[in-house]
């Protein structure tokens, strides 16, 4: 009887240990590095914890948006682990200096009626002359 109690206690501890160690699924993250960049210098955009499910596409659309303009950076494929990386260089004459937002958008569908639901994340990027 005592042996059964010890075995159950150890099994409970193991279950609890794995439950604590398992990563929690959270919202998608977007990061931009560096946050301040000069024209004609490289910028790296990274995403993590983006959904990889049947209702979402695997391609994220990346844009630069300011108060007056919007510029398509390109697209990046979400890997099986929910991450993506894209590098770009803001070119002189195409993008002006100032405060911009890097916008990542992933198209998903509603599981009920198939209507589009977009997952959008934004990060500020300061472009210097």
PLM-predicted stretches and their roles:
Residues 2-4, 12-16, 21-129:
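Extracytoplasmic/secretory-pathway segments with low complexity and glycosylation-like composition
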